[in-house]
């Protein structure tokens, strides 16, 4: 490809600027329509917790949790489960056992996380793990299959199995015998249960986000409604 092929014409640059501005305006408009029962800082029905909100035992747990800032405010995926600090600690331990402590390769693990976030409309972790998934080698077109709940035709066997497994687990609430058998064939018994654990840990945080109607941070996109 010639260098000149990469240069946009003035007209193309103008249209690109218009589309970018329109996209930004749409996000700003959507976020201006937030429900009235949300706290501005957390963009959820509950405020972020401060360390001073907790008793002595809770404060010790607070110091161990990811998302605890220098301002002593807890943000991130454990922000709302930490209303019971022991639950937040348990979820953190589950994450560490399932994700870094599991046997799944990064590609499979990140795809499983994206499926769990998609099935629970979990914007916070979706936005973080979409970028991580791309770095792990997940193609952007595959991510869009998950994002838009598209058919699995044309996907390779492993990717299709991860997505099908997650959709059956969360949407159908019943994993088909053939789907389970294929997962065991691909990742063995331990790997299949590791996949369930990975999906579960992100889904649980997603359920907390659903309960408090957590919205994406300002300027960040939100997942489209599942069809």
Language model segments and positions:
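Bacterial N-terminal signal peptides that target proteins for export
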Residues: 2-16
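Hydrophobic alpha-helical segments
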Residues: 29-227
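Helix-centric, low-specificity signal for extended rod-like, repetitive segments
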Residues: 6, 24-26, 102
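Bacterial N-terminal signal peptides
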Residues: 15-25
């Amino acid at each position: 490809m010639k260098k000149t092929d990469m240069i946009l014409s003035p007209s193309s640059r103008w249209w690109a600027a218009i589309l970018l501005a329109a996209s930004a305006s749409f996000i700003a408009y959507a976020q201006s329509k937030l429900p009235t029962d949300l706290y501005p800082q957390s963009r959820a029905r509950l405020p972020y917790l401060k360390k001073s909100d907790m008793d002595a035992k809770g404060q010790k747990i607070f110091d161990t949790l990811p998302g605890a800032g220098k301002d002593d405010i807890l943000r991130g995926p454990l922000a709302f489960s930490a209303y019971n600090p022991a639950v937040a600690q348990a979820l953190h331990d589950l994450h560490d056992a399932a994700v870094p402590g599991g046997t799944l390769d990064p590609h499979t693990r990140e795809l499983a996380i994206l499926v769990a976030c998609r099935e629970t409309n979990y914007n916070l972790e979706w936005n973080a793990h979409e970028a991580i998934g791309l770095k792990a080698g997940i193609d952007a077109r595959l991510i869009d299959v998950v994002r838009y709940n598209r058919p699995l035709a044309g996907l390779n066997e492993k990717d299709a199995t991860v997505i099908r497994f997650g959709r059956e687990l969360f949407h159908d609430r019943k994993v088909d015998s053939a789907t389970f058998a294929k997962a065991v064939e691909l990742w063995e018994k331990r790997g299949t249960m590791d996949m369930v654990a990975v999906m579960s840990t992100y889904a649980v945080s997603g359920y907390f986000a659903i309960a408090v109607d957590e919205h994406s941070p300002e300027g960040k996109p939100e997942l489209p409604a599942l069809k």
